[in-house]
């Protein structure tokens, strides 16, 4: 099998514009892709780690990741009329449950990671007077994401995305 460098645009990030909030509601979701006007999507995994040193380690620690918060920083230009951007921009002054929805990421192999999410740090416009409006927000996963293999035949127990 030949090795391939995937390009970032091959990843697909979507949000539910119907505002469903649990994985039980996936079949009710109205998915909108974050693509038009979007320049960068940067995934992040903020980890909680235990680094307890034990005597048998002679004072040195081992690292155990005990928790994780997954998020996606999304930036680009505001495109009025785009379903995903319009939905997110409409939540700019929202708080609490109004910022919750469903999201899914499909990697280049077709594997899907779906999760309840919170829309954070929404910037619906901004920039110089003679420039396209900026658009950015953070999409934060709530709880452990559900991973579906590329065949779509079922949920895997692996929470990683190693292609």
Regions found by a protein language model. Give the residues of each.
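Viral virion structural and adsorption modules
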Residues: 1-4, 138-140, 144-163
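Solvent-exposed edge beta-strands and adjacent loop segments
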Residues: 2-78, 116-133
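Acidic glycine-/aspartate-rich tracts in secreted/extracellular proteins
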Residues: 79-81, 144
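Short, acidic/charged, Gly/Pro-enriched secondary-structure junctions
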Residues: 83-116
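A generic "cationic amphipathic patch" detector
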Residues: 87, 132, 151-152
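Short beta-strand and beta-hairpin "edge-sheet" elements
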Residues: 104-148
